[in-house]
Swiss-Prot record:
Extracellular-side segments: 1-317
Protein encoded by which gene: Sgce
Maturation and modification: N-glycosylated.
Family the UniProt entry places it in: Belongs to the sarcoglycan alpha/epsilon family.
Keyword Cell membrane on entry: yes
InterPro entries reported for this sequence: Cadg, Sarcoglycan_alpha/epsilon, Sarcoglycan_C, Sarcoglycan_N
Residues listed as glycosylation sites in the UniProt record: N200
Segments in the Cytoplasmic topological domain: 339-437
Entry protein name: Epsilon-sarcoglycan
Membrane topology of this protein: Single-pass membrane protein
């Protein structure tokens, strides 16, 4: 099948004629053939198996460089590409990951990280994670499977657990093997255990923390839980002192003697440290006492009769509809009597009104009618107070003008508006004598 596909590429070989069955292949064709075969075998063996332990931190890095060779056109040897790549991870057959597994990738130009603490419920069950890589430039996709085989860690218990809050780290920075190794080394120097493992790492944002300001040195913060097989050291116990508890309640930094061993690289908030001793925890599990599985005798079951009496709803219908309808009808009749039968009428009102009041009212109506008739006549001369006093061009004082010798439609809208050439001049009234302003 592979040979057939190889020949479909287009006769990369040529007969030399020097011997039967002798083939000649160019170097470029040879390189293309080997790269194609390598790509096919890499896709066949793309599944990866990992074996984390239950209750111990699991970290798997999705490297962009590993997936770059999966997107066509396949890069040539020595060729460097920096395409943006994002990842989507989910449990096979489900839309999301298991509850204990988290994923983070800051930018399409950084590697993705799967991390979490496997639970004991999944021990012995392979967990298949589908990893889909997206090339944001070419829109090509590549899919790999990550098979997580969770191992049991009951033979190496870690009953003493401590959770630290590191203020100057982000979760992806803390997941780096070098940084996590430095932190575990500092904790081991303070705690002095025989075995020390990281149990879980959680971002402060997942605990309700605030998103930091976009400043260079501002970090989200991260919670790191570690477990050991020996009791807590005296330095870690200093947080439980009443003096340090009082300082923490006053939002002051407690005095810890071993803080200088972390301060060079990690800024720890000692007020948020949590110490858990599982050897002193009282088990709340109650053994279930199983009975015989027989229900107590409740007597003979009596089902309802098949012939049920039909219920008459006629009375309920009358009470529900007839009573409100009767009340509404009575109210309607009362309202009709008040509005129709209790009216006095105009004649009765005039008979009860004195004559002098009727005359006064009639005169008011007559005056109102005359004013309305006068307002309809628009041919009345303008009052002198509304005529212009100053000449619109020269600004000189002019005598009042009558409305019968000029056209009011050609008057300028503003007194400062100059007369245009096509505008008709307003005639002025000639005075017979000398006029004083």
């Amino acid at each position: 099948m592979l040979l057939f596909w190889w020949w479909e590429l287009g006769d990369p070989c040529a007969w030399t004629g020097k011997g039967r069955g002798t083939l000649k292949m160019s170097p470029a064709t040879t390189g293309t053939f080997l790269l194609t075969v390598y790509t096919l075998f890499s896709k066949v063996h793309s599944d990866r198996n990992v074996y984390p332990s239950a209750g111990v931190l699991f970290v798997h890095v999705l490297e962009r460089e590993y997936f770059k060779g999966e997107f066509p056109p396949y890069p040539k040897p020595g060729e460097v590409s920096n395409d943006p790549i994002t990842f989507n991870t989910n449990l096979m057959g489900y839309p999301d990951r298991p509850g204990w597994l988290r994923y983070i990738q800051r930018t399409p130009y950084s590697d993705g990280v799967l991390y979490g603490s496997p639970t004991a419920e999944n021990v012995g069950k392979p967990t298949i994670i589908e990893i889909t890589a997206y090339n944001r430039r070419t829109f090509e996709t590549a899919r790999h499977n990550l098979i997580i085989n969770i191992m049991s860690a009951e033979e190496f218990p870690l009953p003493y657990q401590a959770e630290f809050f590191i203020k100057n780290m982000n979760v992806e920075e803390m997941l780096a093997s070098e940084v996590l190794g430095d932190f575990l080394g500092a904790v081991k120097n303070v705690w002095q255990p025989e075995r020390l493992n990281a149990i879980n790492i959680t971002s402060a944002l997942d605990r309700g923390g605030r998103v930091p300001l976009p400043i260079k040195d501002m970090k989200e913060g991260v919670y790191v839980m570690v477990g050991a097989d020996v009791a807590f050291s005296s330095c870690l116990r200093e947080v439980e002192n009443p003096q340090n508890q009082l300082r923490c309640s006053q939002e002051m930094e407690p005095v810890i003697t071993c803080d200088k061993k972390f301060r060079t690289q990690f800024y720890i908030d000692w007020c948020k440290i949590s110490l858990v001793d599982k050897t002193k925890q009282v088990s709340t599990y109650q053994e279930v006492v199983r009975g015989e599985g027989i229900l107590p005798d409740g007597g003979e079951y009596k089902p309802p009769s098949d012939s049920l009496k039909s219920r008459d709803y006629y009375t309920d219908f009358l009470v529900t509809l007839a009573v409100p309808s009767a009340v509404a009808l009575v109210l309607f009749l009362i309202l009709a009597y008040i509005m129709c039968c209790r009216r006095e009428g105009v004649e009765k009102r005039n008979m009860q009104t004195p004559d002098i009041q009727l005359v006064h009212h009639s005169s008011i109506q007559k005056s109102t009618k005359e004013l309305r008739d006068m307002s309809k006549n628009r041919e009345i001369a303008w009052p002198l107070s509304t005529l212009p006093v100053f000449h619109p061009v020269t600004g000189e004082i002019i005598p009042p003008m009558h409305t019968d010798n000029y056209d009011s439609t050609n008057m300028p809208l503003m007194q400062t508006q100059p007369n245009l050439p096509h505008q008709t001049q307003i005639p002025q009234q000639q005075t017979t004598g000398k006029w004083y302003p």
